[in-house]
């Protein structure tokens, strides 16, 4: 059995999304100045960006998306346990994990300091990311420390949810099987 239940992890992750939504809407620089963003950015050679210094239409849209995801995820936990544990999150957790793995790989491999990228200054160079000016279109706006850290934390969180979910779903199925087998003996 897991130390922390999947319901607790999902509730915490939903509240994390709602909190991020507040900061992206009101003051995105607060997120960009976090120690975790700095440490992961430095360790992975991700460029800094000035796009999170003031609220913008993009950060406001991100805030609304995070708010809706956080609220819908926390509301999904009010369904019956078997429905959200097995059916809803059983498919959502691996899909979200896979999505964030792809976005993380694209963000890191497409960064100006990524290995094997033409014109890269080296793995540990830290240029300032200028969003939307390169040939990569919208992907260039995602190649920075803030996005990398957010996607990295999301990927780790969804992997944790997925692993814990599988354990708890298996335990729920075993409990259901035992209950059905003991219930059938009483009728004989």
Give the predicted meaning of each segment.
Residues 18-32:
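Alpha-helical transmembrane segments of multi-pass membrane proteins
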């Amino acid at each position: 059995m897991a130390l922390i239940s999947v319901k607790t992890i999902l509730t915490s992750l939903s509240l994390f999304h709602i909190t991020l939504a507040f900061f992206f809407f009101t003051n995105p620089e607060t997120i960009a100045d976090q120690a975790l963003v700095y440490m992961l950015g430095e360790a992975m050679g991700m460029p800094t960006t000035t796009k999170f210094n003031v609220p913008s239409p993009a950060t406001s849209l991100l805030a609304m998306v995070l708010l809706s995801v956080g609220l819908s995820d926390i509301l999904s936990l009010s369904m019956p346990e078997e429905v959200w544990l097995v059916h809803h999150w059983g498919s959502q957790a691996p899909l979200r994990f896979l999505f964030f793995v792809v976005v993380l790989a694209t963000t890191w491999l497409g960064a100006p300091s990524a290995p094997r990228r033409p014109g890269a200054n080296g793995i540990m160079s830290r240029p300032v990311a200028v969003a939307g000016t390169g040939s990569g279109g919208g992907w260039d706006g995602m190649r920075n420390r803030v996005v990398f850290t957010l996607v990295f934390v999301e990927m780790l969180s969804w992997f944790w949810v997925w692993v814990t979910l599988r354990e708890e779903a298996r335990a729920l199925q075993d409990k259901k099987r035992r209950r059905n087998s003991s219930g059938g003996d009483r009728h004989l």
